[in-house]
Design a protein with these regions (language model features):
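N-terminal alpha/beta PP-like core and its mobile active-site loop of ThDP/TPP-dependent enzymes
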Residues: 1-180
Length: 180
């Protein structure tokens, strides 16, 4: 899971951020939060949540996310608007920021996702020169792809030495590590 992957990164002195949807997806992060807490490692858990008014209403994906990690996070913020001041982070313990969204934000997120996947990423991968100038410690997470996008992504992976996390929904099952 993304949570345990983040624990591994934290053990190697990275400061990972896990972003997840609402509901039981958040609950799946409890065990990684406990691991990071007892290992004195920082992980920032950013969780999307339904509006605060949905709590205790029985609405889908409206479990009580605020404080779900209990004492295993140094801080838990329940945010439904942009804070006016700085947020304190203890970089030796996990932290949870629960972001409560109203429905009008959905269309913006979908538009941004569509733009990022189709314009920025896919167009670069499909271009004639699929050799990209990659600098630094980058991780590419490849999730659900359209069938026509798979060949371009496979070509990119074959021609570039990058760290990749392939989700099952990506439809990519080849080994591009150069190892048998």
């Amino acid at each position: 899971s993304a949570g345990f992957y983040a624990v591994g990164l934290a053990q190697n002195d990275f400061k990972p951020v896990v972003i997840t949807s609402s509901g039981t997806a958040v609950a799946q992060l409890l065990a990684p939060a406990i691991e990071a807490f007892y290992d004195n490692r920082f992980i920032l858990f950013l969780t999307a949540d339904r509006p605060k008014s949905y709590r205790s209403s029985g609405a889908p994906q409206s479990i009580e996310q605020n404080g779900i990690f209990g004492s295993y996070c140094s801080n838990c913020l329940d945010i439904d608007e942009i804070p006016n001041n700085e947020i304190y982070m203890d970089d030796s313990k996990p932290m949870h920021i629960n972001l409560c969204f109203e429905n009008p934000l959905n269309w913006q997120a979908e538009e941004q996702t569509k733009y990022l996947s189709e314009k920025l990423i896919f167009n670069k991968l499909a271009s004639e020169s699929s050799q990209l100038d990659l600098v630094g410690d980058e991780l590419y997470v490849i999730s659900r792809l359209k069938e026509n996008e798979v060949p371009a992504v496979e070509k990119f992976l074959k021609n570039n030495s990058v760290c990749v996390l392939l989700e099952a929904s990506s439809q990519i099952d080849k080994d591009f590590s150069g190892k048998a």
